Amino acid sequence: MLWVQRKRRRKETSECPSDKDKSPESHKAKNESWIKSHFSRLSEEKLALDNNASASGNATQTESGSEEVSSTVHIETFTTRHGEVGSALHRESFTSRQKTSGPSVIQEIHQESGKAPSTDEATWAAVAACTKEIDTQGRHLAHSMLQRAIAYQHSGHLESKDINQEELRALEEVEMKLQKNFLTQRENTIAGANHTHTFYGHSHHSHHGHPSHQSHSLPNRRH
């Protein structure tokens, strides 16, 4: 009887290691299956969160589309035409302003043309004379500097002692005169702004379709 019990114990002992050998593998398989399902669930949840975030971002961008955006383009030209007596100047100005606020677009076009005022003609004539004088003075100064450059043929450069200060001051005076004429012309242009044609356009980008409005306004103004 005792021998039989020992034999059974040995048999149970010999079977236990096999069960122990199987249990880690089964636990490992269960763990891997749980890990895969867990991370798969996390990935699905993250994907759903990303989709919700992108959708909310698009909604926010649509709502924030109501912010105003404006742009302005201004072009002004002075031209002379062949066949006219004297140096008559023609002034053309074009200004376009556009403001976008959500689905609404407001556009303003300002255009003017015609003969430039006599003050502009006098100013531009003075500018042309100064430009010609600068060219003449500059050429004369450069020529005299090269003539007086003692070491020019040997060194290839000029020194400060080779510059005639009187001619240099004369050139600077002409440049100052030209700058003054440009400033005068700019002040006259700003002060004597002449608004002749102004068009306003207002439109809505929607399904109901609001009509656009245009009006001619702002009569001539002179300061």
From Swiss-Prot:
Biased segments, Low complexity type: 62-73
Keywords: Phosphoprotein
Organism: Homo sapiens
Name the UniProt record assigns to this protein: Uncharacterized protein C10orf62
Biased composition (Polar residues): 51-61
UniProt keyword Phosphoprotein present: yes
Region feature Disordered, mapped onto this chain: 1-37, 49-73, 196-223
InterPro entries: C10orf62
Stretches with biased composition (Basic and acidic residues): 12-37
Keyword Phosphoprotein attached: yes
Lineage of origin: Eukaryota, Metazoa, Chordata, Craniata, Vertebrata
Family matches, as Pfam families: DUF5569
Residue stretches of biased makeup (Basic residues): 1-11, 202-223
Positions of modified residues (Phosphoserine): 43
